[in-house]
Amino acid sequence: MMLISQPMADRPLSWSGLSRRPWRRQLAVTRVFLLFVFFLSWDRLTAPRSAQRRYRRAQWLVQQLLYLGPTFIKIGQSLSTRADIIPAEYIEAFTQLQDRVPPFDSRQAIAVIEQELHGAIDEIFQQFEVTPLASASLGQVHRAVLPTGEAVVVKVQRPGLDSLLNLDFELLHQTLRLAKRWLPGFRRLAQKYEIEAIYQEFFSLLFLEIDYIHEGKNAERFRQNFADYPRVRVPEIYWQYTTRMVLTLEYLPGIKVDDRQALETAGINLDLVIQTGICAYLKQLLVDGFFQSDPHPGNMAVDSQGDLIFYDFGTMAEVKIIAKDQMVQTFFAVLRKDTNQVLEALIYMGLVEPKGDLSPIKRIINFLLDNFRDKPIDIKAFDQVGEEVYAMFQQQPFRLPPQMTFILKSISTLDGIARALDPRYNLIAASQPFIQSITVAQPKRSLAMALLQQVKQFALDQLNRPSRNQQFLQELAAKLERGELQFATRSPEGDRLLRKIHLALKSLIFACLTGFTLLSATVLLSTVYARFAVVGFGLAGLFGLFLLRSLIKLAVQEKLDRLVQKR
């Protein structure tokens, strides 16, 4: 057996040995939580909320999540699907968590394998590579060869993960309870977004994900779903070498799916890869109702024949499948930009909750159909609309079901992979083989009737299409009915007054903070904690500088106002 030394992580990981020191874990989690709340409050106080500022804070938070370990890495990955809760900048930053998890010591991995499979590593495998092939938040993967000669990969769970997750479950539950009790703003947020339910759902899924027997069953089901698809490959599970903490799968090597240069060098047809990926995902979603909810590039590869390989079946999701005739109707609805029928299909599948005002969801569907139906998804266009979409989610009393957010994230990821291979790809063109397979599967009479009905509907839509003036009046009436009509007015005097009030409030807050910290430091001088007084005086000096800056700005603003009034 070949033994290869493994480099250790550069930074000590805070979750190691925590079962013996839970109080240190509590301090680490509390520190990150309080710092994050402080930074958000400081940003709101000292500067307008901007995408750039949020992005910097998101990068900082990613580093902290990596330091806190598996539970919090998974929380970040889960939050990257919640566009209805957090801004786009955080979603973008959280996607970086996929490939930045350091491996653990291979000696620990071997110890887990020997304990779970009841034998020495030399007896279990003919060959075992010590250096991990890949690592993730919950485990890492090693190559091996079975005694019967089959090449396999062995997925090993991080040691002590069970106790760590149980500890974090309790710590986060306590933190949520305290935050809801003492922070009124957080209490309102928790009620609006059902944070308690999200928390319970997250941990129930996480405990399922660390059960590798459950993942093996998912892989078998996925493999059976694609048994008749020769261009899609799914690794076989070796149950004799699989337990709750060890998963042994067939070794299927391939080129990373978004590595365009390597794929071209291997002579692989990129258009066919894109087509296979899009059609495979449509089949998962619309035919099987069982789909991979995290299809990032690390979970897919392309073999030497150009076939698509799927890995990692720990995070799967299910949706209600629709009948083939409904599917045909939905495709035609997309082609003719029928927002209402597309929305009906999403509600039927349980991807949108039919509660409250659905007009914002209609606007999103309309935006997608208008901008991305016949052309590649333009990231710049998404950037332009991202702020508006986030603001809409903040204002509306609804949230998307988890399945819908998984689908949105998956579509976005698949689109990114497709654009990396061919920036000019067309989603509808790539979906044609799947659409044809659906229509061919229909009985001829049923298909003819469906096509005739859709042609009739299209003709009626064209004949009854209102003029531009009529459309404008209809939209105006609809906005009035929904209470969405807004009138924008600007008053220079009002703007100046608001600026002065804002500066005066900032000055007052900084004055209070300066006085409070100065008083606290003075009191500390007369106690046994006198050495900490220097911190209080330092903070008082810092707040004093901010107070001085605010007062100068206020004085300058008053002078400018006087000059304007004289004119």
Curated annotation (Swiss-Prot):
Q: Which InterPro entries match?
A: ABC1_dom, Kinase-like_dom_sf, UbiB_kinase
Q: Which Pfam families match?
A: ABC1 (PF03109)
Any S-S bridges, and between which cysteines? Answer: none
SUPFAM superfamilies tied to this protein = Protein kinase-like (PK-like)
Superkingdom of source = Bacteria
Family statement: Belongs to the protein kinase superfamily. ADCK protein kinase family.
* Protein name in the entry: Uncharacterized protein sll0095
Write the lineage as a comma-separated list. Bacteria, Bacillati, Cyanobacteriota, Cyanophyceae, Synechococcales
